[in-house]
From Swiss-Prot:
Record bears the keyword Membrane: yes
Protein's recorded name: Lipoprotein signal peptidase
Catalyzed reaction equations: Release of signal peptides from bacterial membrane prolipoproteins. Hydrolyzes -Xaa-Yaa-Zaa-|-(S,diacylglyceryl)Cys-, in which Xaa is hydrophobic (preferably Leu), and Yaa (Ala or Ser) and Zaa (Gly or Ala) have small, neutral side chains
Lineage: Bacteria, Pseudomonadati, Campylobacterota, Epsilonproteobacteria, Campylobacterales
GO cellular component: plasma membrane
Pathway info: Protein modification; lipoprotein biosynthesis (signal peptide cleavage)
Family, similarity comment: Belongs to the peptidase A8 family.
GO molecular function: aspartic-type endopeptidase activity
UniProt-listed HAMAP family: LspA
Amino acid sequence: MLKTTKKSLLVFMGGFFLIFGVDQAIKYAILEGFRYESLMVDIVLVFNKGVAFSLLSFLEGGLKYLQILLILGLFIFLIRQIELFKTHAIEFGMVFGAGVSNVLDRFVHGGVVDYVYYHYGFDFAIFNFADVMIDVGVGVLLLRQFFFKQKQNKIKA
C-alpha cells in the first residue's frame, strides 16, 4: 500500500514539474518576443487578468488568492481521497502543474501569459499550454472514471 502511494506521488510530481516547466519555458519564449502569424493561428502576447474567456477579471488582484485557495482545497481533498489520487496521479499532476504555473504568472506578470490565438472562421479565446493541459488532464480523468466505473459494473454483473 505504501509503495503504491509513493509511486503515485512520484508520478504526480513528475507530471507536475514536467507541465509546469514546459509551460514556463514556452511563456519565457513568448515574453522574450517570439511571435508567429498564419491564416489559422497566431502566437501573440496577452496578459489575461481573468480566468477562461477573461471571466472574473473584475476580481483583479484578489483572483490569484482565490485560485490559491482553490488549488489548496483540491489538494487537501485529494489527500483525504488517497485512492482517487493514486488512480489519477498523472492527471492531477498535469492539472496542478498547469494551475500553479498560471497562478505564478499572476504574481510575476500581473496576469496569465496567454499566446495561442485561433481565428480561422471565428475568433476563439486566447489561451496557453497550461490551459490545454488542464483540459486534457480533466478530460482524461473523466474518461478514465467513466470507463473504469463501466468496467467495474460489468465485473459485478
